[in-house]
Design a protein with these regions (language model features):
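A short, conserved, highly charged catalytic patch centered on acidic carboxylates
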Residues: 1-99, 107-149
Length: 150
């Protein structure tokens, strides 16, 4: 098992956010590095080809088989209170993707389809607080690491 470094990921997100010009795509290299650290045998693709329900930001592959997708939103966007087009997209992805992670870099929601094919949030964790100027919640780092390994 390789080492996931959530602290390094958070520090990178915080540093980019501090520029006050970073947006959603600016955080993707750090997210890709974090996802690749889960297991060296996995392939992580940023901006994969479109699938039936849309174009999630990342696909995680084992060989040529997709094992999960990740949708990354901008830091500060509340992924648990989506509205409008973001809410519609989230529902499409939850309905169409059996193993999905939604994140804004700080909040992480993990969805899996149950035996009936219905999307269920199986876990959520927050590794930082946006309202307090991007303060880390280091006690949650191990929980995120465990969820990513799973």
């Amino acid at each position: 098992m390789s080492k996931i470094d959530v602290a390094e990921f958070f520090a990178t997100v915080k540093s980019k956010h501090a520029t006050d010009i970073a947006r959603e795509h600016a955080y993707r290299p750090a997210l890709e590095k974090l996802l690749k650290s889960i297991n060296p045998s996995l392939t992580v693709i940023n901006e994969p080809r479109r699938i039936e329900c849309g174009s999630p930001d990342f696909v995680i592959m084992r060989g040529d088989i997709p094992v999960g997708y990740v949708e990354a939103k901008d830091v500060g966007l509340d992924i648990r209170k989506m509205k409008g087009a973001n809410k519609d997209q989230q529902q499409r992805y939850r309905d169409g993707i059996p193993n999905l992670i939604y994140t804004n870099g700080l909040d992480w929601d993990f969805y899996r389809h149950d035996s009936d094919g219905n999307s269920q949030r199986i876990a959520d964790v927050s590794i930082g607080d946006y309202l307090m100027g991007l303060q880390s919640n280091k006690t949650s780092f191990p929980a995120l690491e465990a969820l990513l390994y799973d």
